[in-house]
Amino acid sequence: MSFSPASSEPHDAPAAAGSSVPASRSIAERWKMEAAPIRARLLLRAFAWLFSLLALVVMATDVHGRGGAQDFSTYPEYNYCLGMSIIALLYATAQLVRDAHRLSSGRDLVAGRKAAAVVDFAGDQVVAYSLISGLSAAAPVTDYMRQATDNLFNDSAAAAISLAFFAFLAISLSALISGYNLSLEAIV
């Protein structure tokens, strides 16, 4: 039995008189809790990868007719949104590979825990802001065109923008977890 520095009660003592739950967690429970943010970030990055891929595919195939107003490549806003989706897809792919390697081997591809935390946080921030920038550039064009006519081209553009927004949400939530991990590294 060990004693807590803040109190004179032992760590293994029950939390309440009639309870059998220990006041502290076992090492295995702590390990599971420490790995929870890593697993959550991996899941969020997988969602970001999926939504970025879908946004890329939907926007790149948004060609209805032969050029002119029914082709996404004639609108620079859509090209920008497509470019940001490509960047998000590449980033999410790299981070998924890195996180999977980290979970499977226990070692990170980036040397140093603090450097890895900074890379995670900065990368998530840059990609999240890039995605929101791309979709906020494309959304007004789609809204304006949908007011004039509602067709498959506009619906596909709106779907691609929505998927890019979901990718943004996943990466921005991953940035919150990365920020939490960075703050823990700054304390240590």
UniProtKB/Swiss-Prot annotation:
Protein localization: Cell membrane
GO cellular component: plasma membrane
UniProt region (Disordered), positions on chain: 1-21
Membrane side Extracellular: residue ranges: 64-76, 136-156
Chief location category: membrane
Family indicated by similarity: Belongs to the Casparian strip membrane proteins (CASP) family.
Record text on subunit structure and interactions: Homodimer and heterodimers.
Top-rank taxon: Eukaryota
Any Pfam family matching the protein: CASP_dom
Transmembrane segments: 43-63, 77-97, 115-135, 157-177
Positions of glycan attachment: 154
Keywords: Cell membrane, Glycoprotein, Membrane, Transmembrane, Transmembrane helix
Annotated protein name in UniProt: CASP-like protein 4B3
Annotated membrane topology: Multi-pass membrane protein
Cytoplasmic-side segments: 1-42, 98-114, 178-188
InterPro entries assigned: CASP_dom
Keyword Transferase: no
